[in-house]
Amino acid sequence: MIESPNRHQHSIAGAYGPFQLMPDVARKFGLHVSAHRDDRTNISLAAEACAKLLKQIAIPNSIKILESHGYRITQEIQEALWFKLFVLHVYHAGAFNVSQAMETACPEEPGMNLIFKLWQTRAGKFQNASQNYSQLAIAAWYELDRHITYIP
């Protein structure tokens, strides 16, 4: 999900570009980051790096976090909306911060109730922006669907 659509902004943590990629993450996925050139501002290259980050880091870490809480993550679960929202939380806040939030929230079962608990949980660096991230994704999906299915 594009986090900084209007202009290229640096986060306090050092993330940059439309997908707010950290320098080390960008480099890991093949982007050039230096004082003279920063591929994080190239929407195509940054989108590809973001997709790799989701596939290679966010999804596997999401599965590890959930399995560490006793949840069995099947292919069917990975296709569920709540799991995709959980992955977005890991993408945005990082696996460590989501793990801390899970320890604090102590959700009893996987599903949308787990996501609702995360929306109300603060732990470590999992704060307001992290809580709201999947809500923004839902709003974006809703708007996209509304425009795709629009009939004048």
Model-derived segments and spans:
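Catalytic glycan-binding domains that act on GlcNAc-containing polysaccharides
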Residues: 1-152
